[in-house]
Curated annotation (Swiss-Prot):
It comes from Listeria innocua serovar 6a (strain ATCC BAA-680 / CLIP 11262). It comes from the Bacteria. Pathway: tRNA modification; tRNA-queuosine biosynthesis. Monomer. One of its GO terms (molecular function) is S-adenosylmethionine:tRNA ribosyltransferase-isomerase activity. Its main location: cytoplasm. Its EC number is 2.4.99.17. This is S-adenosylmethionine:tRNA ribosyltransferase-isomerase.
Length: 342
């Protein structure tokens, strides 16, 4: 299929720049993936679509405050570093600006010297392998010195960095939030659990590649970025039992879907305990083996994520739903409203 087939007109004012005061006060569009019927509801109405014996699968990754501002020791030049992926030990793959100032062997100091870095290797496109030195626990130092790397379409400063974390975020490693989960509060999850729905966690660390535009004309030529995922034995067993008993598996976010479908596609539809890297690209024609329904936000035109949701329903129904969302002034993207495809 052509990438252009997934385009739609989106007024810039519908791109949500800040989160709502209450996580659960966002709107919810409900789409029947077979009939295309659309209902406009509130996010708390999601409870009525979840039944006893279903599984609600959430991604418990935690966004790192991965943007650091430092000084090149040799010259005093200001350097911005964005952490991308942890390598061995204290080495990280990073994006450095301006990259030309940081060559192999250069050193950078952050804050009052609590964190230092040495360039081990130069990569293309501004990438650098940096080795960090510090006292204490790295993630605690990062919390003190780092900034949250918000998506490029969000222009406003975030007053409360916790609003770009889910309430159940636990596993450090993401460069971006699994934004479908931002709508849930602990109270709402407790209400869902009390109904007999099983709350199950997976981990997928979202990479910055999630914001990278698709730069090919035909979808079959697109190469996905890879992201680290983990599914525990307990979570795998619980989901398998629910599916065997006829319960539905409802994924919260495209990251949860990509985790489950990566594993199921390798093991004849069954889920097993597994961790690794996935570059699965889900687009129309893909046959889902693990997931029945999806809670997600509204995605960018011509993105791999709108292709994924089109695979769960179909392209014409999704684009009709998106056009309806524009007409009804839904809020789009990371801090926007939600959609339930079932």
């Amino acid at each position: 299929m052509k990438v252009e087939d997934f385009d739609f007109d989106l007024p810039e004012e519908l791109i949500a720049q800040t989160p709502l005061l209450d996580r659960t006060s966002s709107r919810l569009m409900v789409l029947d993936k077979e009939s295309g019927e659309i209902k406009d509801q509130h996010f708390t109405d999601i409870i009525s679509y979840l039944n006893k014996g279903d599984a609600l699968v959430l991604n418990d990754t935690r966004v790192l405050p991965a943007r650091l501002h430092g000084i090149k020791d040799e010259t005093g030049a200001h350097i911005e570093v964005l952490l991308l992926k942890q390598k061995e030990g204290n080495a990280w793959e990073t994006l450095v600006k301006p990259a030309k100032r940081i060559r192999k062997g250069a050193t950078i100091t952050f804050g009052d010297g609590a964190l230092k870095a040495t360039c081990l290797e130069e990569l293309e496109h501004g990438g650098r392998i940096l080795e960090f030195s510090y006292e204490g626990i790295f993630y605690e130092v990062l919390e003190q010195l780092g900034e949250m790397p918000l998506p490029p379409y969000i222009k406003e400063q975030l007053a409360d960095q916790d609003r770009y974390q889910t309430v159940y975020a636990k596993e450090n490693g993401s460069a971006a939030a699994p934004t479908a989960g931002l709508h849930f509060t602990e109270e709402l999850l407790a209400q869902i659990s009390a109904k007999g729905v099983e709350i199950i966690f997976v981990t997928l660390h979202v990479g910055l590649g999630t914001f990278r535009p698709v730069d090919v004309e035909d979808t079959q030529n697109h190469k996905m970025h890879s992201e680290f995922y983990r599914l525990t034995e307990e979570s795998a067993d619980r989901i398998n039992k629910i599916k065997s008993a006829g319960g539905k598996v409802v994924a919260v976010g495209t990251t949860s879907i990509r985790t489950l479908e990566t594993i199921a596609s390798r093991h004849d539809g069954k889920l097993i305990a597994e961790s690794g890297w996935t570059d699965i690209f889900i687009s129309p024609g893909y046959e889902f083996q693990a997931v029945d329904a999806l809670i997600t936000n509204f995605h960018l035109p011509k993105s791999t994520l709108i292709m994924l949701v089109s695979a769960l329903s179909d392209r014409t129904k999704i684009l009709a739903a998106y056009n309806h969302a524009v007409e009804q002034q839904y809020r789009f993207f990371s801090f926007g409203d939600a959609m339930f495809i079932h």
